[in-house]
UniProtKB/Swiss-Prot annotation:
Disulphide bonds in the chain: none
Function: Produces ATP from ADP in the presence of a proton gradient across the membrane. The alpha chain is a regulatory subunit.
Record's protein name: ATP synthase subunit alpha
Name of encoding gene: atpA
Originating organism: Pseudomonas savastanoi pv. phaseolicola (strain 1448A / Race 6)
Location in the cell: Cell inner membrane
The family this protein is said to belong to: Belongs to the ATPase alpha/beta chains family.
Membrane topology: Peripheral membrane protein
A GO molecular-function descriptor: ATP binding
E.C. designation(s): 7.1.2.2
């Protein structure tokens, strides 16, 4: 047997080491290691980027969300039943994009922008990235133009401006969606384009919303993005970003748009599901650590941008116009608990909230807006002049009424001033009630507020406030159409309008026809 010299052994090893090729090889293709619950683990995708689209056999796509040392965790967009262990996965070098443009108006699409309304393919070629960086501070402009929701309670006390983020928060089944849908219906003649994003809702509910928008003539002005409860968690997580990109198309071209996210609680639940399946460490209420960033990067994209931004974006094609994207995110609370994790996050991100209360809804006050805890942080500057002038005492009257009503339960005899204040509060509360799918014009709203502010409701029975208001508005639209048209066009409040309203209401009250 031949004996090897130790020095020879070391020479052989050195030679082998020198010949070894240790240069790293970039690989564009990997192998599926495991598939479960819409999550795919892939080995060998060395140069994949976060958020990049990954192509699987059969035209199925995924999105890279976890970049680990020896594998990539990706979420499948759509059905994952055709995928199996051992299949190949390729990098595409692209991030997720969805179709954008005016061709989407009047259509219902899924989270990836595919039409689901049976009206044929989309006739557009333009696409844009789902994840985009929000405009910087320099490119933004302050909010000073109103978005009329058509609700007295909102437009008078919690006004919303173009480019604002106003949260609608409350328990289930108390009119959150109804308020948002009415706001969309009210935009059909305002020139504001609308996007309605349905996240994790029943398909029957989404179909009902689409039907109501069509019946009220607002669908032609609206894009509906639907990620129903039967869709995968990945599509429910992506739907708000897709809708936001579609809304930004209008903002960046000097138009105004309104987007409703219904609702972000379900998006957070979908994201929690994805994160737990990706084995990310859970935090409070089992949500991942970046659930705040999930909503902040979405809602920061709603903004009012300057003329310079629009001009730069359109390469000078549009000049002298600002663009805006107004967001109405909806959050569902559990038994009125606004201190839960997701509600507190979204309250801190948005520019105010409209708080809907179960007790008010159940007592027949609809919309059930609690004026005491609802606030609009930037909308005051955007409020129409006449509404701002006439709504000053409304909020105070309601706040004082709620406080006095609590004490009045224990007091047996009340002084005259307190009794009058209580009665005025009851009348204002009654006046704030409004039927669904019946948004009001600025002139109609101003007339109601004027009657309350100037004491014309004092001798009207509380039970007849609603019929009095309807008859008064009908009378003014018939006999004082010029005055109403002037208010709707300009929104100003002057002595001429003041005296015209006063004389008209006095004349109407003399007829006693309500």
């Amino acid at each position: 047997m031949q004996q090897l010299n130790p020095s020879e052994i070391s020479e052989i090893i050195k030679g082998r080491i020198d010949k070894l090729d240790v240069t790293s090889q970039a690989r564009n293709e990997g192998t599926v290691v495991s598939v479960s619950d819409g999550i795919v683990r892939i080995h060998g995708l060395a140069d994949v980027m976060y958020g990049e689209m990954i192509e699987f056999p059969g035209g199925v796509y995924g999105m890279a969300l976890n970049l680990e040392q020896d594998s990539v965790g990706a979420v499948v967009l759509g059905a994952y039943t055709t995928l199996a262990e051992g299949m190949s996965a390729k990098c595409t070098g692209r991030i997720l994009e969805v179709p954008v443009g005016k061709e989407l108006l009047g259509r219902v699409v899924d989270a990836l922008g595919n039409p689901v309304d049976g009206k044929g393919p989309l006739n557009n070629t333009e696409t844009d990235a789902v994840e985009k960086v929000a405009p910087g501070v320099i490119w933004r402009k302050s909010v000073d133009q109103p978005v009329q929701t058509g609700y007295k309670a909102v437009d008078a006390m919690i006004p919303v401006g173009r480019g604002q983020r106003e949260l609608i928060i409350g328990d289930r089944q108390i009119g959150k969606t109804a308020l948002a849908i009415d706001a969309i219906i009210n935009q059909k003649n305002s020139g504001i384009f609308c996007v309605y994003v349905a996240i994790g809702q029943k398909q029957s509910t989404i179909a009902n919303v689409v039907r109501k928008l069509e019946e009220n003539g607002a669908l032609a002005n609206t894009i509906v993005v639907a990620a129903s409860a039967s869709e995968s968690a990945a599509l429910q997580f992506l739907a708000p970003y897709s809708g936001c990109t579609m809304g930004e198309f209008f903002r960046d071209r000097g138009e105004d748009a309104l987007i409703v996210y219904d609702d972000l609680s379900k998006q957070a639940v979908a994201y929690r599901q994805i994160s737990l399946l990706l084995r990310r460490p859970p935090g409070r209420e089992a949500y991942p650590g970046d659930v705040f960033y999930l909503h902040s990067r979405l809602l920061e994209r709603a903004s009012r941008v300057s003329e310079e931004y629009v001009e730069k974006f359109t390469n000078g094609a549009v000049t002298g116009k600002t663009g805006s994207l107004t967001a109405l995110p909806i959050i569902e609370t559990q038994a009125g608990d606004v201190s839960a994790f997701v509600p507190t996050n979204v309250i801190s991100i948005t520019d105010g909230q409209i708080f809907l209360e179960s007790a008010m809804f159940n007592s027949g006050i609809r919309p059930a807006v609690n004026a005491g805890v609802s606030v609009s942080r930037v909308g005051g500057a955007a409020q129409t002049k006449i509404i701002k002038k006439l709504s000053g005492g409304i909020r105070t009257a309601l706040a004082q009424y709620r406080e006095l009503a609590a004490f009045a339960q224990f007091a047996s005899d009340l002084d005259e001033a307190t009794r009058k204040q209580l009665e005025h509060g009851q009348r204002v509360t009654e006046l704030m009630k409004q039927k669904q799918y019946a948004p009001m014009s600025i002139a109609d709203m101003a007339l109601s507020l004027y009657a309350a502010e100037r004491g014309f409701l004092t001798d009207v029975e509380i039970a007849k406030i609603g019929s009095f208001e309807q008859a008064l508005i009908a009378y003014f639209n018939r006999d004082h159409a010029d005055l109403m048209a002037k208010i709707n066009v300009k929104g100003d409040f002057n002595d001429e309008i003041d005296s015209g309203m006063k004389a008209g209401i006095e004349k109407f009250k003399a007829t006693q026809t309500w």
